[in-house]
Design a protein with these regions (language model features):
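Conserved short submotifs of the Hanks-type protein kinase catalytic core
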Residues: 84-98, 102
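Protein kinase catalytic-loop region centered on the HRD/HxD motif
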Residues: 123-135
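Activation segment signature within eukaryotic-like protein kinase domains
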Residues: 117-118
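A short, aromatic-enriched beta-strand patch in the conserved N-lobe beta-sheet
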Residues: 79-80
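AlphaC helix of the eukaryotic protein kinase fold
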Residues: 47-68
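C-terminal lobe helix-coil module of Hanks-type protein kinase domains
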Residues: 176-266
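Conserved N-lobe ATP-binding subsite of Hanks-type protein kinase domains
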Residues: 25
Length: 293
């Protein structure tokens, strides 16, 4: 465990502990050279501990994967320090709170706010899927979305993200958060791909807009208007399509999903009724004009 006040590599001063996991701690640190705050993740190495070795290698792979990424909704990795008994990963310090805490405090979020978040999340997932090879995030959930004081969001924790292998039949390891994870994440149903992230995003949007945690009873994704009749039928259709059991029945890309989200009102029953009314009015006026000739 790092000691408060110590310097790492002669420039990162440890200020305080801000997070703790089973085999790692996260600290707030000040870069003495740049006068800038960073988050520093410390992962301990334990000799002759195979589980720890897997954790360390996974952390290094995660850091190296993220180090090459550059997107406004992703934290940056700026330094990886590999010591004899510990690894330090230096990354953006993200102020704010995860959306699961927002849900616990405030309940269901306003539909328009959720739509805005959905657009941002589609954008960052599409960015990941466009990498070469594509990166499949696999762990979309409110706990991994940080809401910053300025209202922007950041996607965090790439612990189970993986690079898509074109010739693999299925994932080598079954990982995911039950309730949010797609069926194919638990093996025997093919390799996870971009449609897996679309499923997880659909469940996340469901939780955000209804306040109903998919990890709690009734453990099912109901149509969102079952919980709140005032919600959009267009958004309801989008979430239901995202969360189809069969990946072939979901949106096939985040670009396709984003288009649907941007035009969700056009699939709304109220909108369609208004458009039909306008059309009937137009035809009525046109008919009246023809008759008067």
């Amino acid at each position: 465990m790092a000691i408060i006040g110590t310097l790492i590599e002669g420039k990162y001063e440890i200020l305080k502990l801000i997070g703790k996991g089973g085999m790692s701690e996260v600290y707030l640190a000040m870069d003495k050279n740049l006068n800038k705050q960073w988050a520093v993740k410390e992962i301990k190495k334990r000799a002759r501990d195979k589980n720890n070795e897997v954790v360390v290698q996974s952390a290094i792979a995660e850091a190296n994967m993220m180090k090459k990424l550059d997107h406004p909704c992703l934290p940056r990795i700026v330094d990886i320090i590999d010591k004899e008994d510990v690894i330090y990963v230096v990354m953006d310090y993200i102020e704010g709170e995860p959306l699961n805490k927002v849900l616990e405090r405030d309940g269901a979020q306003p539909q328009e706010t959720v739509i805005e978040w959905a657009e941002e999340l589609c954008g960052v997932l599409d960015y990941l899927h466009m990498q070469n090879p594509p990166i499949i995030y696999r762990d979309m959930k409110p706990a991994n979305i940080m809401l910053q004081p300025n209202g922007n969001i950041k996607l965090i924790d790439f612990g189970i993200a993986r690079e898509y292998k074109e010739h693999n039949l299925e994932d080598t390891v079954s990982l995911g958060t039950k309730g949010y994870a797609a069926p194919e994440q638990f093996g025997g149903k093919g390799q996870t791909d971009q449609r897996t992230d679309i499923y997880c995003l659909g469940v996340t949007l469901y939780h955000l807009v209804t306040g109903k945690n998919p990890c709690e009873p009734p453990y099912e994704i109901y149509p969102i208007r079952y919980w709140n009749p005032n919600l959009s039928s267009g958004l309801e259709s989008i979430i239901l399509k995202c969360t189809r059991i069969n990946p072939e029945e979901r949106y096939q890309s985040c670009a396709e999903l984003l288009y649907a989200i941007l035009h969700y009102e056009e699939a709304d029953e109220t909108y369609q009724k208004k458009q039909k009314k306008k059309l009937y009015t137009f035809y009525g006026m046109l008919l009246a004009a023809v008759v008067s000739l």
